[in-house]
Amino acid sequence: MTIWIDADACPRVIKEIVFRASERLNLPVMLVANKPLAKHHAGLISSVVVDDGPDVADDYIAEQATAQDLVITADIPLAARIVAKGAVGIDPRGELYNEDNVGERLSMRDLMQSLRSEGLVQGGPAQFGMTDRQRFASSLDRVLTRMMREAKKQ
């Protein structure tokens, strides 16, 4: 199992939570970005810098992630792709992506994008806060526990 992070827009605090979980559980982490990242922990944590361009990092993650992997991303189209492959996805606010909700979230994203482009809605998601951080840490712990238990059964 590998934890993939769509790193360009992922909050630093979320990366730190994942790094701690990686160390505790001895799980590899792969950060994917289209620009060089700040130095990070060594050992289980690696990074890859992909070419600049829209969706290049997403394409890389979608191609490389397997059904046994966890992907951390706020990008709903990427989430839909990895869920279709059988991988697990979580957004930085701790919301789990699954077959039941990813289609609805993709439709809502497209609707909001359309409304914003027409000037009917302004702004984006609420500012990232302490509650989001706690929700993410809790979700990450639950998901990793479940995935590791399932991996042991196989």
From Swiss-Prot:
Organism domain of life: Bacteria
Family annotation (Pfam families): DUF188
Protein family membership: Belongs to the UPF0178 family.
NCBIfam families to which the protein is assigned, alphabetical: PRK00124.1
Alphabetized PANTHER family for the sequence: UPF0178 PROTEIN YAII
Protein name: UPF0178 protein Glov_0658
